[in-house]
Amino acid sequence: MSYMKNTSPFLPGLHIQSLRKKPRSSAQVMADETRYKIEKSLLGLKACFGRFIPEDYLENNATGKHSRHRIFNKETTFWAFFSQIIDADGGCAEVVKKLKTYLDFKGHQSLSASTGSYCKARKKLQETDLVEILEHTAESFLVNDDDQPLAGRRVVVVDGTGLSMPDTPENQAEWPQISSQKKGCGFPTMRLLGCFDLATGALLSHGIGSKKSHELPLLRKQHDTFKKGDIFLGDKGFCSFYDIEQFRKKGVDSVFPLARRIPKTEQTCIKKLEDNDLIIHWNRPAWYKKAPLPKEEWNQLPKIFILRQIKVTVDQPGFRVKSFYIITTLLDPQLYPARDIAELYYRRWSVELFFRDLKTTTKMDILRCKSPEMIQKELLMYFIAYNAIRHLIYESAHTHEKDPMRLSYKGALQALRQAEGYFNHAADSLKEIRRLRRNLHDSISTQIIPFRPGRSEPRCLKRRSKSYQLLTRPRHEMSEIKHRSKYRAKAA
């Protein structure tokens, strides 16, 4: 056939015309344009946090999920998810409408208001990639020794908290509700344990379990977080002979209050350093069924520990506890005075404030996703966003010579929300981005938390809740009491 004639005398049998690249369809061209404009709409977040989250973590995969050119590729999906976390509403619909509004403003109306494509793209994000990004945000803090709380050593403060999530069969199977609640009347509950850097507030690692999970087993899964020279700081729930030994092997010292043991006296101590400051010994407890080691391995633990016991007297009004004992492996009274150790434990309360920033300010207390797989990704994104904001706070503090723990996390989040749109408009100008970044640091540095040591406020609600009935049976079986505002329960 004449039209199949070879046009190249140098390559006999080869049809040059058939090797031409297939022209792209109008739909493919429009998809590329939409993806490019969506990426530009998220450049504000990238300009703020791109130096904390390297681009190579967000490149499309070679094969498998997020390997094809889509509107929501890997990088776009990540930054859209990030934007969803820091938004005041935090819903999928809000972030999609934000992107659609930007495209409409640019005269490009090809993005649907449906959240289906975005939710499918979120599901394709690999949990291992998010874990690597979180570890990078935690390890990239450059902290001076002068900023460390005690003798230039990093202090890792640990505590646990609870979270709830949508009532779906999958979530209930993974994190069941408490047994005292009727089926259909409660929500899945999760136990979360976090390890935080006391100097920066950054989350170093985390562990999750059901509400029945004790915090000690969750901590033991995170022992690799601790490095030689660190100091472990915890509450009385972490007072454990076994864990002291595991930390000692890693070159990590421990500070926690005494629990489940009778304090030593001057008559039974090894040495008295000062009043209420004693060098003591602990005997290895007898093996028990729920011990973390088999009996043979348990008996190989040291029979005696040499520790330090410090009695702390609380003479400030408003505190329930009047005195307590601190146990520590920091034995040198010259390098670690008793007063410094007591003040370090006093700062342990900061971990409660870190969780408040996550749960109340960033609204992580009630998770949104409906499957365990997405719940874990949602948690990781919350932690990544939290660490990234902590980076901004730490930079602002050093730029303006302020204490990073005195700068407001909520103030930083508010400043970031307002500045995000201006970063988007300045995305093409590096000079303008630097100017906006300086302005953002200035804004964050002005949000200083007042110094209120020893403040005591009861955890009570002043605003009364509405007079709605409590759900005491599944909703489809529940009947509403008429005139509930006038209803009074009869005495038994």
Language model region names:
Residues S2-V96, K124-L125, E132-I133, T137, ...:
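Single, function-defining residue in the core of a domain
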Residues G91-Q109:
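DNA-recognition alpha helix
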Residues H108-E127:
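Major-groove recognition helix of helix-turn-helix-like DNA-binding domains
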